[in-house]
Structures are given as C-alpha cells and as structure tokens.
C-alpha cells in the first residue's frame, strides 16, 4: 500500500513539474557511429558530426580493445552514410579505416570521442553561504475595486526548517506586460506572503504577468540565493568562449541534496556530452553526478541539472564540483559486425538463356558461410522494382526467360551467415548490363504467315492465269485446221472416193502400201468437217489407179517420213513398163485441205520403190479411193463452181447436208450424186523423192466416208521468181460430166501461151488450174459444164516423159507430205512452185507477185535456193486462200498425171 502511494506521488509530481527536463542522451557522433570489419585485415567505422559543432570544437574517435590503452583513429570526410541516418540536417559524414591483423571472438572494441582541447570548470561550495529557500506556491490573484491582491504560500515544515524561519525570508514580486520581457519587469519586495498592485503600478488596458520568489532577508545569518520563480526566466551572460560550459551553479537545499546546474550552447551540446563531477573533499576521489537533466533556455543555450547527494553535511561541508566532457563508449563485437568486400559480377550467355556468375574475396577463415543477394531489372525499371533472389553458398544463377530486345541490369552483394559470425551486406557489386537478342513477336509471325499465304495464293492465281494465257498462245501457234483461212465458204461435205460406183464393183478391198485394208471405206456415207482433224494418208502407187490390178500386193511398207526433203529432183531415163513404179501417196480431198488417210501416222509420201510384179500386172485401185487429183491436159482452166460441175441435183443434195466446218476454215462446195472421177496418169521421169503425187478429188456420196484433212505446210518448199506466170487457182475436178474422156486420167487443156488468167476477188469452192501461154478460156459461172480438155489424154499404159529438173516452169501436181497428224508440201526440186496472193483490197485487180519476186535476191549458179519458212508460206496461202500450181507446157502433156 505504501509503495502504491509512493508511485502515485511520483506520477503526480511528474505531471505537475512544469519544467521540461530531458534525460542524458548520446551525442550525434555516438548515435551515428557504426564499425564493421572484414575479419581479416581492417575495421571500417563511419560516423557524423554537425557543421555547427565543428565551428566550435572538433572531436576525435578513440578506440580501446578490452582494457588496452586508448588509441586515436584517423578519419576522413565521406560523401554518404550508408549504415545509419544522421538526426541533424547538417551532418558531416566521416569514414575511418583501422588496420587490424588479429580478430578474436573474445575481443571487445570500445570507441569514444574526445575534444581536440581540454574543456571544464571548477567550484568550491560553502553550505551556509549557498542557501536557497523554497519557492512560493499557490499563487492567486483577487480583485478589490481598483486594486489587485496577489497571494501565495511557503512551506517551512521540512527537515531544514530549523535552518530557516519566517524572519529569514522575504518575497520578491515581479510583474510585466505580456509582450514585455522579464528583464524589463517591475520588482516589488514584501516580507509577507501577499502584495497589492494598485493603479499606480499597472497600465490600463494591458495584460500583465507576475511571478514571486523567496529569498533570504538581509538580516539573516544565512546567505544564498532566492528560490526559483514561478515561471522560468532566461538571460545572457558576458561573452567569452562559447564552447565552454557556463553559469555553473550549485545550491544546497539545507538537508541532503546539492543541486547543480550549468549552461552550454546548443550547438556544442549536440556534439559534446558534458558531465558533472564532484569531490566531497579535496583528497577524495572524483565522482560523476548522474543523472544529468537538460532544460531548454530559449534558442541559444541548454541548461543541465544534476543533484549531488549530501549524506553528512556536517562532516563534508565543502564539495568540489566540475563540468567536463564525458567519455561515452559503445560496445562493438568484431565477429558479429563483418562486412565483406563486394563480389565481382559477370554475365554469360548459355544457348538461349543467360547466367550470372560472381566471385568473392577469399577470407582467412574458409568455414564461414556466405549468403548472396542478386537483383536484376529492366533498363526502364528502378532497383526498388527489381527482382531479388537470395542464394546460399552459390556463385552462379541461371536467369529465367527474359524479354527479347531488352536491356537488363544486374548486381550482387554478400554477407556472412554462419552461427557466431554475423554482419551486414557488403556493398553492391558494379552493375552489369546486357541486351537480349531480338525475337519476332508471335503476332508479327502470324501476320507474316498470313501475308505469305495470301502472296502464295495470289502468285498461284497469277501464275495459273499467265500459264493459261501462254498455253492459249502456244495452242494458237500450233497449226490446226480449225484455224485455217484457206477457204471462206464454211464447211462442205465431200464424198470420199470409195463411194464411186466405177470403183466399187469388181475391185478388191482397199489395200495400202503396207498391206493394210480398209473395208470401212467400201460403204458410202457423207463426211462433215465440223472439227478439224488430220486426214488419213494412204501410200498408193498412181499406176494402181490408172492400170488394172493384177497379182497380190507386193508393195513394201514405206519408211517414216524424213524431216526434210531434198529441194531438187534426180533426173533419169524413163523406166520400162515392167520396172517398179515409184511409190506415191494417195490423198483424199475431203475438205478445205489435202490429207492422207489414217492408215499411217508418219508416212513417207514418196514411198519406197516397189518390187517388180510378175507379168507386168499392177494392182487395181481400191474401191472408193481416189489416189490423186487429175487435172485437164493443159492450158488454163477457168474457175468452175462445184455445183455447176456436179449438176443442180447434186448441188442441192450437198446443200442439205449439215455443215460441220470450223469457223475460219471454209471448205469447197460439193455437189450431190455420184460421178466418175476425173483421173489422170501420174507424172513419170522423176525419182522417188521428187516425184509428186496426185491429189484425189471426188464428188461425195451420202454413203462415202470422210476424214478431216490435216495442215498443209512445207519445210522443203523452195520459191523462185516466176514473173511470167499469171495468178491461177487449184480447182477440184468434181462431178465431171459423162461426156468427158472415159480415161481415168483426163488430159490437160491447152491454150495460147502468154494469156494471163483472171484474178478473182473471192472464191467459193474453186480449184483453178495453171494457165497455158496463149490461151485463157473461161467458163461462165452459170454454165454447169466445165470446159473440155483440148490436150491429148495419157493412157494408163503410156510412159510419160521425164520432167527436167532445171525447167524454169516445171509441171507437176501439188502433193502433201504427212508428218504426225499434219501435212506439209514436199520439195518439188529446183523448179518454181509459185504461190500468188490476192490483193489486199477486195475485187479484181492486178496479181501480186510471188514471194520470190517480193524478195529480189540474186542467186548465183549452182547455189541452193533459199527455203521459205512454213509460217511465211501459210501466210501467203491465207492471203490468197487457194493453192496455185505452176503452169504446164503444152509440149509436155504426159507429165500431168
């Protein structure tokens, strides 16, 4: 219970104590002092002082190991304080390095600060002369009309009351206005515990402040100082060394306590800690008073208070009191204050990832464990936002997947982590940076794939279109009967030779040069040329047509067509009747082209020499086949319409047949009704390669089979100028009347030499024969009977005269040579084969010179005539739209068939 009352009294005393006293605190150098060692070679200490304190006094760091002597430490100015924060805004950091070769777990280092010069003061105190009476309390003021009464009380019942009596005390009253200072305040003395302030003391309409204190009366045997004022007061002393403690005062309370106080400048007190040291007698040992309390005195000084106990005032009546800097120490153990050197950091790349590797300074004690802290961040981030990893006793770390095309920074630090050894983190290593490789993001790859896919699709589309166009152009360049412009009368249905009654009875089946038979040609059926097809080619001997057949077929198979025919014939004497004839090609004129039958795909139109037959008999022509075209015996033949040549009835029947010719490929008109074909003997006197074959022409019957013709081209045709020949046309001799010569090969019509033939602007199924000099017979368009041949007719048994290969106007028939599915004009030797072109303007006009005349080139003797390309030849054909044979001479009628 007594203890509780005592604690309550102390609490109330603390609350009622108006003075603000702070306990003794550490100075700023001691507060900021931090020391760490590497436990190998040195100790590093960091502390700070204030700029204001350095202007008055400098302090030095002192080190003491265990109980050894004090050793000053040299320190340098530093830029920062990484280990602690300075409580003052104007701190001056310092860094000290203390070499040390020995570190023991039991060693303890003591650090303190000492001023650069001696600082202190001394005082001798006599108790009777240093008496301070108690201060007044219960100060009250009351109003009495225009006066004010100030009252207070003093407690004299204490143990020292026998020293003091009311007669030894007096009271000093000080009052002032609120805005005035206490130095300017008025003073009133009173020997009682009250004082009266009247109007003469106070100013109207002002606020005053008063305070009272107790002091010894002048007649008292005691001396000392008055008690404290109710409120505290501050004043300045004379100037001097501002770093020295000032106004040291000690007062004995007359019982057992000697209270001492002193003042120190605030700037000095922040750096140097002063303590109160006293001696009860001069021979006694010096002791330090504690605790020391501080009190603020305005903005310049700080007052320190300390109470010295006086156990026996009678025995020890004189105390020696001094104020001097205290030696404050701080305990720092080396084994728990280790800071290692910063590691050295390197960045390495391992394939697609990155790794951090570091090395630390080797310590003397290898059993101490290490803990590493690694930080890495992007270049745009700060270290506070970085990623931190902590590893134990490791010297490398593999980084996770990093962002591409990004700069990264990394750093590392280390600290000890073994039991009994502790410290702080080392300084951060030097930050290392590196740039990651660039990688295309997924959305870019997706866009690239999309664009590539679109580009490939577009490329395939355009390539397909371009390839289709190239294919179309290539197909257009390929010769095709459907594209020919040789004839302009549309399609025509012609009757194959097999439908002719003259050859259907008493004749063996059609047999080709290879022994193949075509029984399908025995029937009679119409042929429509809707689609251009290659006409079949049958290699036949013209003599088989003109002579009666006898004996078996001994014609050998012809070899394949050579790619090029010699341009000149081989002249020779006429052969006997039993000599094997030259094998020739038989063609069907069943459309706007001359083509061979399908008996062979690549025939040799000139064939191979036929072995002699027994008894001189020859094979009869196959039924329904006309091997070559027989022309009149000479002279110029006028253009005869097909309908007129075949008769009105036949023409009507032909017109009723459906036209299947391709656009741009007109064919000859055909008359209806069968008629005996006009056949002529083959031309003799030529070798196998230069012997022309006859062109078969027949009037179709509804039952005759027809085959589409092939292209006409020539790789070996040689053109020579023929200025004297007039424009002629090849006219089919179809449907000749019965009053013509019964011979299988009609003769050539003769005429006067030099008579030019008429030039026709349009042709509707005509074949014009070459003119004979001096004659130019014509047949009116309305005359259905063609002109009669005037020249003698060759019999099948007669041998024609040889054709001179050097004749300027050789005579012969236009034959075709099949290569694959196309027909070409074979070479006719050195003789000219003139193709004349129609004039570009419609209507009759002068003839256009042949190609050799268009290109006037002088040819030296013995030099081969240059060959005209096939395309140029067919361009000439397309300009004229009909084939022109060279003129025949009258004196060589036997060379017609």
Swiss-Prot record:
Spell out the GO cellular component terms annotated for this protein, sorted alphabetically and separated by semicolons. Answer: external side of plasma membrane; granulocyte macrophage colony-stimulating factor receptor complex; plasma membrane
Positions of modified residues (Phosphotyrosine): 766
Q: How does it sit in the membrane?
A: Single-pass type I membrane protein
* Any one GO MF annotation of this record: coreceptor activity
Report the residue ranges that make up the Fibronectin type-III domain in this protein.
133-240, 339-436
Q: Has the keyword Plastid been applied to this entry?
A: no
Give residue spans on the Extracellular membrane side: 17-443
| Cell compartment(s), UniProt | Membrane
Which residues are the signal sequence here?
1-16
Disulfide bonds, paired cysteine numbers = 35-45, 75-96, 86-91, 250-260, 289-306
Instruction: Please describe the quaternary structure of this protein.
Output: Heterodimer of an alpha and a beta subunit. The beta subunit is common to the IL3, IL5 and GM-CSF receptors. The signaling GM-CSF receptor complex is a dodecamer of two head-to-head hexamers of two alpha, two beta, and two ligand subunits. Interacts with TMEM102; this interaction occurs preferentially in the absence of CSF2. Interacts with FCER1G; this interaction is direct. Interacts with LYN. Interacts with JAK1.
What disease does the Swiss-Prot or TrEMBL record associate with this chain?
Pulmonary surfactant metabolism dysfunction 5: A rare lung disorder due to impaired surfactant homeostasis. It is characterized by alveolar filling with floccular material that stains positive using the periodic acid-Schiff method and is derived from surfactant phospholipids and protein components. Excessive lipoproteins accumulation in the alveoli results in severe respiratory distress.
> What family does the database annotate?
Belongs to the type I cytokine receptor family. Type 4 subfamily.
Q: What does this protein do?
A: Cell surface receptor that plays a role in immune response and controls the production and differentiation of hematopoietic progenitor cells into lineage-restricted cells. Acts by forming an heterodimeric receptor through interaction with different partners such as IL3RA, IL5RA or CSF2RA. In turn, participates in various signaling pathways including interleukin-3, interleukin-5 and granulocyte-macrophage colony-stimulating factor/CSF2 pathways.
Q: What is this protein called?
A: Cytokine receptor common subunit beta
